[in-house]
């Protein structure tokens, strides 16, 4: 966002700042779980024709320097292009794991098998208000890390930290996988609070896209604006993340 060249520069900045992992999304229409900021980012990327092959080329360029998780939507990317084909191509490009967006847990077993065949770990997504059965399904299908959604609603909302530690502790008792906290982390302070709550990974998405959007609107440099913001996030992560 807004184009592949900007994304390339931002990936290079992530490498320079020591970011451990990046979630790279294949843009898609009707991103109903995303707030306005990420919906605008999807739209800008689609206008630049950010195809699967173009995104995977970026992955191939950077996969030896930083772990890249590929976020692919079930309805708009995986099923239309073919789950097995997408996963095999992603693995060949060097993707470190895959996050299937919009995939119901009841369909997760077949996806997990396809990912296993491709040699790709799967990121499981779980909401705080998930039913016990849904939790059981997601935990059983997760092989990379578990993405705990901090707030129910659309991405970019405020974090409610009051019971996050309890939720993370409860999940940790049932999975050996690292636990990531995301959906609503907007500042270095939020990143610090995520680690204070016991998460292993803090995910910031909308706020980074917001830096790009703000720079585009004001005639600034999105690479510098988003890059400096990433540096501030990474500094907080480095200072607060458990050793």
Residue ranges, per PLM feature:
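Glycine-rich beta-to-alpha transition loops that act as phosphate-gripper elements at the mouths
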Residues: 1-3, 71-81, 104-105, 126-130, ...
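Glycine-rich phosphate-binding active-site loops on the catalytic face of alpha/beta enzymes
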Residues: 20-31, 93-99, 103-107, 146-156, ...
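Charged helix-capping and loop-helix junction motifs
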Residues: 81-88, 160-167, 222
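Short beta-strand/loop segments at the ligand-binding rim of alpha/beta enzyme cores
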Residues: 63-73, 115-125, 171-184
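Glycine/Thr-rich beta-alpha phosphate-binding loop at enzyme active sites
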Residues: 38, 135-173, 211-217
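Catalytic cores of alpha/beta
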Residues: 3-16, 130-141, 181, 185-202
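Alpha/beta catalytic cores of nucleotide-metabolism and tRNA/nucleoside-modifying enzymes
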Residues: 172-180, 186-243
């Amino acid at each position: 966002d807004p184009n592949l060249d900007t994304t390339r520069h931002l990936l290079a900045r992530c490498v320079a700042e020591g970011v451990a992992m990046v979630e790279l999304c294949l843009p898609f229409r009707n991103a109903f779980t995303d707030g306005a900021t990420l919906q605008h980012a999807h739209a800008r990327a689609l206008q630049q024709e950010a195809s699967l092959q173009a995104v995977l080329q970026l992955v191939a360029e950077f996969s030896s320097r930083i772990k890249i998780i590929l976020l692919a939507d079930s309805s708009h990317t995986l099923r239309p292009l073919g789950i097995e084909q997408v996963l095999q191509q992603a693995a060949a490009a060097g993707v470190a794991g895959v996050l299937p967006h919009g995939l119901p847990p009841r369909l997760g077993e077949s996806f997990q098998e396809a990912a296993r065949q491709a040699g790709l770990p799967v990121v499981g997504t779980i909401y705080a208000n998930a039913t016990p059965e849904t939790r059981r399904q997601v935990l059983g299908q997760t092989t990379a890390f578990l993405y705990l959604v901090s707030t129910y609603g659309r991405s970019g909302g405020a974090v409610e930290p009051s019971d996050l530690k309890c939720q993370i502790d409860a999940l940790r008792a049932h999975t050996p996988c690292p636990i990531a906290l995301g959906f609503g982390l907007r500042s270095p302070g939020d990143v610090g609070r995520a680690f204070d709550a016991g998460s292993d990974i803090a995910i910031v998405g909308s706020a980074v896209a917001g830096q790009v959007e703000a720079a585009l609107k004001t005639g600034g440099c999105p690479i510098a604006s988003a890059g400096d913001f990433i540096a501030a996030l990474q500094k907080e992560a480095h200072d607060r993340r458990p050793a």
